[in-house]
Structures are given as structure tokens and as C-alpha cells.
Amino acid sequence: MIFVLDVGNTNTVLGVYDGDELKHHWRIETSRGKTEDEYAMTIKALLNHVGLQFSDIDGIIISSVVPPIMFALERMCLKYFHIKPIIVGPGIKTGLNIKYDNPREVGADRIVNAVAGIHLYGSPLIIVDFGTATTYCYINEHKQYMGGAIAPGIMISTEALFARAAKLPRIEIARPDDIIGKNTVSAMQAGILYGYVGQVEGIVSRMKAKSSVPPKVIATGGLASLIASESSVIDIVDPFLTLTGLKILYEKNVDKKQ
């Protein structure tokens, strides 16, 4: 079985693959202060809950956009799993032709999403990932990673309203009854939800205009389903795109690392 870890700024998503099947998956808070022992105890409890042990895991791959956490995670893998993990980063075999000015600047999460997107859906392709930041990745018809856009995530914007506007409350992100809010909470929900729908449709439409072949638009991340339900430009919601990409990259690199 293969253990995959997608470390984001807010949450870490974990998955266990048995062959090509994602058997189990979990979401935990990303904590920069945890030691390798604390992470091991959390993961041990999750594995035990589904009848698994550290010894059931044959390989590990990690994608992270939080560099300070990597030391603890790598030590955890060595100490408890007795496995040296594959880390998504410079030197890893991806198969991507990255056309960024500096390819090393492309975040691990965006690389993993692009690998999975091309494998599952072909090209051209636009991938929208709703995380702490909302990222847009454009892959052309030649399967070249051309770049994209990065915007503040929905939660960041919501928290900024609460923190900077004295009379505005902290709210749940949800679909309001109407675009015209009748109270403060529904007005904020309308502004946040439909504001982001407008952002997605505006950026995606401009990216589509760069391609002579209509690209598929794939959405992933925690709020992808909510945004997609209100948008006409998203073709597919794939909540496990990043985990799939990690599994693919593991297979591309495992022989090289062993």
C-alpha cells in the first residue's frame, strides 16, 4: 500500500492507495509546531481506525507547500514507517514540460495537479484549485505547463472581512437564498460566493481565449463543488485530483529512488 500526503497551508490531506484504488483518505490540520512523534501518533490513530498498521505501508510520497514542516514529516517516515519518502520537488521525475520563467518556483501542489490532470483528462486543460490560495494552472494542447494565476483563497477573504471590518461577523461559507442579501450574513455570503464565481469565470474565460482548442476545466479543493454548482465554466469536479497525482508521481519515481 502507498501512503500519500498533500501538505497545504491550512490542511493536510492523507490517503492510502491499494493498487490504483484510493482505499482511505483523511483531512487533518497542518501544524507547523508538531514533532515527528506527534504526527506519528495522529497518523497511527487514523490507520488503526481502518485496521492498518505502519508496517502495511510499502511506500510514501509527500507534496508540501509548507517547507518548515518537512523535517518532522521526513523523520516520522524514517522512524515509524522505516521508509524514506519521495518528496515532490526539484529532481523528481514528473514528465511535465514546464514553461515557467523559473520552473523551480512552481508549487508542488500545482505540479501534482497538472500531472494528474493530464493523465486523467488530457490536454489542453485549466485546473482550478480552491485552497488557502486559489490557483489556476494552464496546460496547452502540447501538454506544456504554461503557468497560471494565483489569487487569495475564499477563506482568506472571508477572514479578512471579519478581521478588518468591525461590524461584520465571521460567517459560514454557504449558498445564500438570493443574490440580494436581506441581512448582513446573507449579504456577505452572496458577495463572497458570487464574487468568487465571477473571479473564476473571468480568469477561466481569459485563459480559454489563449487556446485555439477549447480546454477542459477541472476544479479541485475543499470548496470546488460549491463554486462549480454556481458556475458555467467548470466541467469536472475532482476532489481527489492531488492524491491521484501523488500516486502517479510515486510510480514514476519509485524505481529511481530504491
From Swiss-Prot:
Give the domain of life.
Bacteria
A GO BP term, please?
Answer: coenzyme A biosynthetic process
Keyword Aminoacyl-tRNA synthetase appears in the UniProt entry = no
UniProt KW Translocase keyword: no
Report the subcellular localization: Cytoplasm
Gene Ontology terms: cellular component: cytoplasm
Q: In which pathway does it act?
A: Cofactor biosynthesis; coenzyme A biosynthesis; CoA from (R)-pantothenate: step 1/5
| Residues that, per the record, bind K(+) | 129
Under Enzyme Commission nomenclature, its number is 2.7.1.33
The residues listed in the UniProt record as binding ATP, with positions renumbered to this chain, are 6-13, 132
Substrates-to-products reaction catalysed = (R)-pantothenate + ATP = (R)-4'-phosphopantothenate + ADP + H(+)
Per UniProt, where does substrate bind?
100, 107-110, 184
Under Pfam families, the record lists: Pan_kinase (PF03309)
Instruction: State the Gene3D superfamilies in the record.
Output: 3.30.420.40
Question: Could you give the subunit structure recorded for this chain?
Answer: Homodimer.
Q: Per the similarity annotation, which family is this?
A: Belongs to the type III pantothenate kinase family.
Function field = Catalyzes the phosphorylation of pantothenate (Pan), the first step in CoA biosynthesis.
Quote the protein name from its UniProt record. Type III pantothenate kinase
From which source organism is this entry?
Geobacillus sp. (strain WCH70)
